[in-house]
Design a protein with these regions (language model features):
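Hydrophobic faces of well-ordered beta-strands that scaffold small-molecule active sites
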Residues: 20-25, 44-46, 64-67, 85-87, ...
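Generic C-terminal helix-cap and adjacent flexible tail
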Residues: 163-173
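Short helix-capping segments at alpha-helix termini
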Residues: 14-20, 106-108, 167-168
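Active-site-adjacent beta->alpha loops and helix N-cap segments on the catalytic face
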Residues: 1-16, 30-34, 44-79, 89-105, ...
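Short glycine/proline-rich, acidic loop/turn segments that cap or connect secondary-structure elements
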Residues: 123-137
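Conserved, mostly hydrophobic/aromatic
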Residues: 36, 85, 125, 160
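CE4/NodB-like, metal-dependent polysaccharide N-deacetylase domain
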Residues: 79-80, 163
Length: 173
């Protein structure tokens, strides 16, 4: 949904090389799935369960991570071939407690909470059973992106990862 995403993805894939796995979100159409794969994306994230996007990702043999909120939507996503499911907006519906509740009856679901995940609460989502977290404006604010202040964004990402890794080393329990 970002204008010019194609050149950004191509540049990122070229800069990062094989050691980094890059994907693309927010993917809304099967045409964008094909473009993203051609440019080097290894996975696709969509904001909701889209049959077209799911089928295109399956045909392209790349991981697909649709967005969902309710247990029924999550089940539908997995029934359609999702590799993981993005839960959005996680913090607005109970945060880590909601993730734990979703996983209660189906502990095998791999959920990625997004929306309101911060450096302060990310570990709580992992403790609740999240497979990964999605964090955006809390470490990469729009004003920093617009101004091209990549050093600040890089520092914030590094700080977040260092903090999270320390917490993970201390243990999830």
């Amino acid at each position: 949904s970002i204008p010019g995403w194609e050149s950004l993805l191509e540049h990122a894939c070229g800069e990062c090389g094989d050691g980094v796995v890059l994907g693309l979100g927010t993917v809304l159409t099967n045409e964008d799935v094909s473009k993203a794969i051609d440019l080097g994306a290894s996975f696709i994230v969509s904001p909701y369960v889209s049959q077209d996007v799911m089928e295109a990702a399956t045909i392209e043999d790349v991981a697909v991570i649709p967005g969902a909120l309710t247990p029924g939507e999550v089940a539908t996503a997995y029934n359609m071939g999702a590799d993981m499911v993005k839960i959005f907006p996680a913090s607005s519906v109970g945060g880590p407690k909601y993730i734990k509740s979703l996983l209660g009856p189906v502990p095998d679901w791999e959920l990625i909470p997004t929306g309101g995940v911060t450096p302060d609460n990310a570990i709580d989502f992992f403790r609740a059973g999240a497979a990964a977290v999605g964090i955006g404006t809390n470490i990469a604010p729009a004003d920093k992106i617009r101004s091209g202040d990549w050093d600040s964004v890089t520092d914030a990402v590094r700080d977040f990862m260092d903090r999270l890794n320390r917490q993970l080393e201390e243990g999830i329990q």
